[in-house]
């Protein structure tokens, strides 16, 4: 459960990355592919897996924009993320463990780029991404 302090830290962070979703998203996704090459199997149409690849940039931006959009829905993540959970769980059949792997790559990318990524912010981001991961995995049960 996110505390009010966590929510404030998340909102501040998400506002700061709003204009950088393509760059940060592409790097996080490329990091996922490099560190966990088995995840490439979910992207058969991708011809490249670097942060400079057009499809990596596009998909990475989609993911980070979706996270930024949760800024308005921190008190109702289950409802807000339901369609994405259904798409990934029932349509794309993504192994839910991959959400945790990608969350870790997102956190590392944010830490590498944002001076504001204090220990307190790191804790809030971990809790937030853990909650997002839980909600995206919810329809697998």
Curated annotation (Swiss-Prot):
It holds the Pfam family Globin. SUPFAM superfamilies: Globin-like (SSF46458). The keyword Transferase does not apply. One of its GO terms (molecular function) is heme binding. The keyword Metal-binding applies. Heme b binds at residue 88. Keywords: Heme, Iron, Metal-binding, Oxygen transport, Transport. O2 binds at residue 59. One of its GO terms (cellular component) is blood microparticle. Gene3D superfamilies: Globins. InterPro entries: Globin, Globin-like_sf, Globin/Proto, Hemoglobin_a-typ, Hemoglobin_oxygen_transport. Red blood cells. GO terms for biological process: hydrogen peroxide catabolic process. Residues 1-141 form the Globin domain. Belongs to the globin family. Involved in oxygen transport from the lung to the various peripheral tissues. Heterotetramer of two alpha chains and two beta chains. This is Hemoglobin subunit alpha-1. It comes from Torpedo marmorata (Marbled electric ray).
């Amino acid at each position: 459960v996110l505390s009010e302090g966590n929510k404030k830290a998340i909102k501040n962070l998400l506002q700061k990355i709003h204009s950088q979703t393509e760059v940060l998203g592409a790097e996080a996704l490329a990091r996922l592919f490099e560190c966990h090459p088995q995840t490439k199997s979910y992207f058969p149409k991708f011809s490249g897996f670097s942060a400079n690849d057009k499809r990596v940039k596009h998909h990475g931006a989609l993911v980070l924009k979706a996270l930024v959009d949760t800024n308005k829905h921190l008190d109702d993540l289950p409802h807000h993320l339901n369609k994405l959970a259904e798409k990934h769980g029932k349509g794309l059949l993504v192994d839910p463990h991959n959400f945790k792997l990608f969350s870790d790559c997102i956190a590392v990318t944010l830490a590498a780029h944002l001076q504001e990524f204090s220990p307190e912010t790191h804790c809030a981001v971990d809790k937030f991404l853990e909650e997002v991961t839980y909600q995206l995995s919810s329809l697998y049960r």
